[in-house]
Amino acid sequence: MSRRVILVTGTPCVGKTSVARLLASKLDALYVNLTELAVRENLISGKDEERDSIIVDENRMQHKIREIIEGCDQNDIVIDGHYAVSVVPKKFVTYVFVLRRDPVELRKFMEQCGFSGRKLWENLASEILDVCLVDALNVHGKEKVCELDVTGKSVEEVISEILDVLGGHKGCHVGVVDWLGKLESEGLLGEFLKI
């Protein structure tokens, strides 16, 4: 069996870490959380004070990820992070799972996690405007990118969908959600795009 490198990406608070950790456990895979790796290995080039977030040194991160993948004994590696497609060398990637969540539900999760002000609205806009999906498609194309609507689903339900794709029982699809159209039809677009 050849090694699979599986990226789990999406807007902050969409459920990446919960899904990626459980997926890695089910696959007996190596789990890599990019934010934790950046902090642990000091792969940080600065801090964005306004957004209260770290700025990752992408070149050093790419080098470290390459080392991890090439040195791994396990068949599967699950990598978790909203910028995973920017730092994991394309040649290693088997699948990119882009998790999507209805912005109305996502806003509640973000507020529960302490997001507010500009950080909240920028991340909601990112989800509405498909930023993580577009980034994944630009790097990997439709063949490797799987868009999953996780709205209202348990982690186990999402894992089941991913395992169906990995097992060849279900294909990858993009164009699954249209948050812009949904919010516009519900008269909520102006409330959510506040940048």
Task: Please place each PLM-identified region on the residue numbering.
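Hydrophobic anchor at the beta1->P-loop junction of P-loop NTPases
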Residues: 8
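P-loop (Walker A) phosphate-binding loop of NTP-binding proteins
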Residues: 11
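Conserved lysine of the Walker
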Residues: 16
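Hydrophobic positions on the alpha1 helix immediately C-terminal to the Walker A/P-loop
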Residues: 19, 23
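ATP-dependent small-molecule kinase phosphotransfer cores
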Residues: 30-88, 184-187
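ATP-dependent NMP and nucleoside kinases share a basic, alpha-helical "lid"
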Residues: 80-119
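NTP-dependent small-molecule kinase module
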Residues: 137-195
